[in-house]
Amino acid sequence: MKKIALLVFSAVLVAIAACTKENTSEVTFAGIEVEVGENNGNFSKLYILNEGAYPGASTLDLLDFKNKKYCTDIFAQANPEVVQGLGNTANDMAVADGKLWVLLNASNQVAVLHLPDAKLEKVLEVDSPRFIVNEGKYAYITSYAGAVYGSEDMVPGKVYRIDRTSYAVSTVEVGYQPEGLAVLNGKLYVANSGGYNWVHDNRISVIDLSTFTVERTIEAPVTNLFQMCVASGKVWVSSYGESTWTQDSQGDWIQSVSAPQSLTSVNPDGTCQILDGVHADKMTLCGKTIYCFGNDDEMTGGYNLCLYKVDTENSNFQKTGFAGSDLSRVAYPYGILVNPDNGDIYICDASFTAGSKVHCFNASLKHKWTVDTGVGTGHLLLQ
């Protein structure tokens, strides 16, 4: 899995993706008929965000459950006058107040779209936006703040606080290359990755939302922090782990893993606990259960892709290997979302050279359907 943050997909989220319902005004987009079954819970739409081939154009697609139709690039359909399209290297999206916020990393922008018609309402300038969470009247967005991979300059990241009505912006400085963020008890927790630095970051910045200042930092027991969520009174943070790359005599690059991908719980008092046996690459939260996938054999040099279901109440987890199950349909998992109404699991199967796919599995991990999507599919959101 890629460690360089610009090539990462999340959220996740950790994007992590949202499970919220919108108004039901009928809007028609051009699309093709698809077979997605009858039972999709109470949701009528699945928004699908394609990153594009880096640094190519990102697109927003729509899977219309009600009309069994797949609609490609609905942003272009809704905004033909915007000739440059949605933007480049989409990294996360979230819905609030009937609007879809799309973070465009390589474009240094956040596009705010009205729903359900996907009309562009506002473009905000944010340096390398990464992840978004909404709390109260504000959107909070992590930003690399202009950091450049390979540069000797250590540029701290920022969190942007944006008023969702006036679009007024405030910022606060955090750690290096911040990624996921989550809110617990009036505090905003920020996962700092340090992904552009030779020594990765292990700090979690804790921001008091009432003052929008960093009140403390927590030293996590792992580095290269990535996605975040809140469940069972704790913050949960994933890590990309640590690895080095060397060239062999034939010039091929060989990866050596020194620390695995992981999932760590963080208590409000700052104490942390690594959940042994869970290798979390991308994750999503549904209820009190974290769903994530990763390579279970990465420390031994093998490749055993597994899906983990983590009960955040007691930290017990179930593990299912992709090989030998219906999950084997997935070639390159790049994003995940769970339907809270029926337990369906949606997994992005990304390609950065051609079209990707989204696979749907029921709660028993039996395949239900697959749809063809755009290039670099990595982010999903139910409405």
Q: Whereabouts are the PLM-identified features?
A:
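Predominantly soluble domains enriched in secretory-pathway, periplasmic, or organellar proteins
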Residues: 20-383
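Positively charged n-region of N-terminal signal peptides that target proteins for export
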Residues: 1-4, 21
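C-terminal motif of bacterial Sec signal peptides marking the signal peptidase cleavage site
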Residues: 15-18
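Sec-dependent N-terminal signal peptides
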Residues: 5-13
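Short, basic/polar N-terminal leader/transit segment immediately after the initiator methionine
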Residues: 3-6, 369
